[in-house]
């Protein structure tokens, strides 16, 4: 489903950010830049419990992500999808992994009482202007 010419945006070494668009409970849109990973089938998103992202993803609201090329923001891929999985298990390890991807070190600050949660988003539609 991912266009071959745009696959590089999902690779670890590209370090592309995604812009996650969600619909809040009251129907208003919200967009957040995020770190992400790709397991070949799902986009992996990590957040802390009770944050805006967590509340919207937990409701299984449809999502959209724009992933621009880090070197040319006019080249991008848009992914629309659905949340298929949510777990707190391994949540802190996942944010450490993402910290390593984007900052080169696994050591992510652990905040007292913070619970990390990982979501898997399955793409349902993919659009790209990369040829």
Task: Please name every model-derived segment.
Residues 54-60, 76, 104:
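A short, polar/proline- and glycine-enriched secondary-structure boundary/capping micro-motif
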Residues 9-12, 56-57, 98, 121:
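A generic structural signal for nonpolar/aromatic side chains embedded in well-ordered alpha-helices
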Residues 51-53, 72:
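Short, surface-exposed beta-strand-loop junctions and turns on beta-sheet-rich folds
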Residues 15-49, 57, 63-67, 78:
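Short beta-strand segments
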Residues 1-18:
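Extreme N-terminal tail/first-helix region
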Residues 4-8, 53, 94:
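Hydrophobic alpha-helical segments typical of transmembrane helices
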Residues 26-28, 69-73, 111-113:
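A short beta-turn/loop motif at secondary-structure boundaries
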Residues 2, 75-131:
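Charged, gly/pro-rich active-site loop segments
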